[in-house]
């Protein structure tokens, strides 16, 4: 078992590199432990198509490694939820296009007393992706063949902010509450353009077209949860109330511009121009009350009531 005084200190890692064609990569993590307190920084940036952090980086940042060093008997459960914390995780896999991404955040955990525990975190991530595709294809039909060529370009970027807070407070030996709150803001922009031609083997154009679509969206989310707990004098008899509240706002707008020229019918051109926009606002309220009564011989009776709007 590690003694508490041996868990005081700091450690971290740093990595930096540069290459041809303005390629770069950087990563840093700093973790500091004190009595009943942990603070962490995690950051990265690169344009070599590497997204997210490793599992060990995430555990050090969130405090999982400190829990593992705590020693003692019993069992321990570690939940990996990068989406909930806002930390992007890297589980491998191939990424298409040229991507530039930055991510970084702060985490602070502190036990103010045996009755008061606080966990907070903030994380930001940015991703920029450029994707170019070209297709050259010959199609063979019973009536003959034709050549199809297409070039496409996709540009997209996304910003994400997320903050989390958890306060666990024991009021006395029988009563406690746990407050959990999270807020996030995200914004994304996309532009996609394709140009294509269809021609006979001798180069005679049959049709050609160009299509451009754009989409811009943003969203704000806020969720809070208050868990109230009471333990009666009789062992195993408890009552709890869980109150939830959430706000969600999302909006998006997009455009479509398309022009297609058909040469098999001289002078026939098809033009399309469209715009669309959406706004969604939601509020949610919820409450759950649960009562547990011991029946003896490790058996319990639980009654609960739940409401959600």
Please provide the spans of the model-predicted regions.
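Membrane-proximal, glycine/serine-rich, low-complexity loop/turn segments characteristic
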Residues: 1-193, 211-253, 285, 290-308
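Solvent-exposed loop segments that connect transmembrane elements
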Residues: 143-145, 195-208, 259-271
């Amino acid at each position: 078992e590690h003694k508490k005084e041996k868990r005081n200190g700091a450690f971290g890692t740093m990595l930096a590199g540069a290459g041809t064609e303005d390629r770069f990569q950087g990563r840093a993590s700093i973790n500091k432990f004190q009595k009943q307190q942990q603070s962490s920084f995690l950051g990265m940036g690169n344009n070599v198509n590497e997204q997210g952090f490793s599992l060990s980086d995430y555990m050090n940042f969130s405090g999982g490694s400190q829990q593992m060093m705590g020693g003692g008997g019993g069992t321990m459960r570690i939940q990996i939820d990068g989406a909930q914390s806002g930390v992007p995780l890297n589980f491998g896999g191939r990424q298409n296009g040229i991507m530039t991404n930055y991510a970084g955040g702060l985490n602070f955990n502190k036990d103010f007393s045996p009755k008061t525990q606080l966990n907070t975190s903030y994380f930001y991530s940015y991703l920029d992706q450029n994707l170019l595709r070209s297709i050259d294809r010959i199609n063979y039909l019973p009536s003959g063949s034709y050549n199809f060529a297409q070039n496409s370009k996709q540009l997209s970027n996304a910003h994400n902010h997320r903050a989390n807070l958890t306060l666990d407070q024991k009021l006395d030996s029988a009563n406690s509450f746990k407050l959990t709150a999270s807020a996030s803001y995200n914004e994304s922009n996309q532009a996609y353009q394709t140009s294509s031609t269809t021609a006979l083997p001798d180069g005679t154009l049959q049709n050609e077209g160009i299509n451009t679509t754009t989409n811009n969206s943003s969203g704000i989310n806020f969720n809070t949860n208050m868990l109230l707990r009471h333990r009666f004098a009789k062992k195993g008899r408890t009552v709890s109330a869980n109150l939830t509240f959430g706000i969600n706002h999302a909006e998006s707008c997009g455009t479509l511009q398309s022009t297609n020229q058909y040469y098999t019918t001289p002078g026939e051109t098809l033009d399309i121009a469209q715009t669309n926009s959406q706004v969604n606002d939601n509020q949610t309220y919820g409450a759950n009350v649960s009562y547990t009564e011991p029946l003896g011989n490790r058996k319990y009776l639980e009654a609960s009531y739940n409401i959600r709007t």
